[in-house]
């Protein structure tokens, strides 16, 4: 398995410089979603002092023609800080800064899905929507070969790898542990991790987060994962079906509840929400991966713990359904439900917005409603 050239550099030499004092200055790494709707970009600027809140961070700009977001003849785009985290790579007082992207005319960039999502979340803030997202990913070498797999073959069939322990079952745990601790340091609301069904496939969970914070925390968790993998010389892919054949795909199962669902007899509200979702299946399929459903078509086959992309289904403890109601929720008659359709490479802003539009704003039809300002 191939690893990157950078991972073979002497990290001790780098540490000699990273241990130098930086005075009162602060390094702020600005992070944004590029024009693919999946990739992340970043660049760093120096601040004179440590910012206490995101509002103290200055707006910045970048060359959108190099990120698939504009043409070269009019390439300046704006970075507007919206969320701030501690930097686990440079450590305190340095910061990671998540940004929204705006075009030259101050309109949101096409892949700035946070802007409208924030507006939708504000409309239902009195219902306190909570989300938890289960991010699956696969570790790969720089040659595109799964981490730890035989160079000219396949590992043993699925079965012993899910939550597995041992060198022959868990591939790349060092990366998982490093990512977990880095997220905790940064202030990302990471709540767990586990090895998944396919060897070299892992999952981490983010949440519960209310409203727009779900997307903010998941995007930063993804960024941290990419940076950790960069240090180890490997790649984390969110491809929903990285290996064709009899291997599990990768999803981003999304758990959702409102205050009413979490209270006594909330199961009635959960069932009402699921009924609304059943009547808008194709709208959600289009929102649940960056290619309008084409990526998920490779994953949602009705096999390997997935539903069929063309059919809506729901059930208690059923991992082959579109919507799963956890058994404990069915017993306690309150709690949350799990939408198992989102792909691993989904935009969390698109997913959470779609759920709120259908379940709380009672939208119907195949297109989102355009609300007046």
Curated annotation (Swiss-Prot):
Tissue: Expressed in microvascular endothelial cells.
GO biological process, one term: regulation of protein localization to nucleolus
Post-translational modification: Acetylated by EP300/p300; acetylation is stimulated by increased glutamine levels and promotes ubiquitin-mediated proteasomal degradation.
Renumbered residue ranges of the record's region Required for glutamine-induced ubiquitination by CRL4(CRBN) and proteasomal degradation: 2-25
Molecular-function GO term, any one: metal ion binding
Record: residues binding Mn(2+) 1: 134, 253, 338
Regulation: Glutamine synthetase activity is inhibited by methionine sulfoximine (MSO).
Residue numbers of N-acetylalanine PTMs: 2
Quaternary state and interactors: Decamer; composed of two pentamers. Interacts with PALMD. Interacts with RHOJ. Interacts with BEST2; this interaction tethers a fraction of GLUL to the membrane, causing a decrease of cytosolic glutamine synthase (GS) activity and inhibits the chloride channel activity of BEST2 by affecting the gating at the aperture in the absence of intracellular glutamate.
Induction: During erythroid cell maturation.
Name the UniProt record assigns to this protein: Glutamine synthetase
Family: Belongs to the glutamine synthetase family.
Mitochondrion listed as a keyword: yes
SMART domains (alphabetical): Gln-synt_C (SM01230)
Cofactor: Mg(2+); Mn(2+)
Domain GS catalytic: 113-373
Residues that coordinate or bind L-glutamate: 246-247, 319, 340
Species of origin: Mus musculus (Mouse)
Binding site for Mn(2+) 2: 136, 196, 203
Keyword terms of this UniProt record: Acetylation, Angiogenesis, ATP-binding, Cell membrane, Cytoplasm, Endoplasmic reticulum, Ligase, Lipoprotein, Magnesium, Manganese, Membrane, Metal-binding, Microsome, Mitochondrion, Nucleotide-binding, Palmitate, Phosphoprotein, Transferase, Ubl conjugation
Reactions catalysed according to its record: L-glutamate + NH4(+) + ATP = L-glutamine + ADP + phosphate + H(+); L-cysteinyl-[protein] + hexadecanoyl-CoA = S-hexadecanoyl-L-cysteinyl-[protein] + CoA
Keyword Disulfide bond appears in the UniProt entry: no
């Amino acid at each position: 398995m191939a690893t990157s050239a950078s991972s073979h550099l002497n990290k001790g030499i780098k540490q000699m410089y990273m241990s130098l004092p930086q005075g009162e200055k602060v390094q702020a790494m600005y992070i944004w979603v590029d024009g693919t709707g999946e990739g992340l970009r970043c660049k760093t600027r120096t601040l004179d002092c440590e910012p206490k809140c995101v509002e103290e961070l200055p707006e910045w700009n970048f060359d959108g023609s190099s990120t698939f977001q504009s043409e070269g003849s009019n390439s300046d785009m704006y970075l507007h800080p919206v969320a701030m985290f501690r930097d686990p790579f440079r450590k305190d007082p340095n910061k990671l800064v998540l940004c929204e992207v705006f075009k030259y005319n101050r309109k949101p960039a096409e892949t700035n899905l946070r802007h409208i999502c924030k507006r939708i979340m504000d409309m239902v803030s009195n219902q306190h929507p909570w989300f938890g997202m289960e991010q699956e990913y696969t570790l790969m070498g720089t040659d595109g070969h799964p981490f730890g797999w035989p160079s000219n073959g396949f590992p043993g069939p699925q079965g012993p790898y899910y939550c597995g322990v041992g060198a022959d079952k868990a591939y790349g745990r060092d990366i998982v542990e490093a990512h977990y601790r880095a997220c905790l340091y940064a202030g990302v609301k990471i709540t767990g991790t586990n090895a998944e069904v396919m060897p070299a496939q892992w999952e981490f969970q983010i949440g519960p987060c209310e409203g727009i914070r779900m997307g903010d925390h998941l995007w930063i968790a993804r960024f941290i994962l990419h940076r950790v993998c960069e240090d180890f010389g490997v790649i984390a892919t969110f491809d929903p079906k990285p290996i064709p054949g009899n291997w599990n795909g990768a999803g981003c199962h999304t758990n959702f509840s409102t205050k009413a669902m979490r209270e006594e007899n909330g199961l009635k509200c959960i069932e009402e929400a699921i009924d609304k979702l059943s009547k808008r299946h194709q709208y959600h399929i289009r929102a649940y991966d960056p290619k309008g459903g084409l990526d998920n078509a490779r994953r949602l086959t009705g096999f390997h713990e997935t539903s069929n992309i063309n059919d809506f289904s729901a059930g208690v403890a059923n991992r082959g359904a579109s919507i799963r109601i956890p058994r404990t929720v069915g017993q306690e008659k309150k709690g949350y439900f799990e939408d198992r359709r989102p792909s691993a490479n989904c935009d969390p802003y698109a997913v959470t917005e779609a759920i709120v539009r259908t379940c709380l704003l009672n939208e119907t039809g195949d297109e989102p409603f355009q609300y007046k300002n």
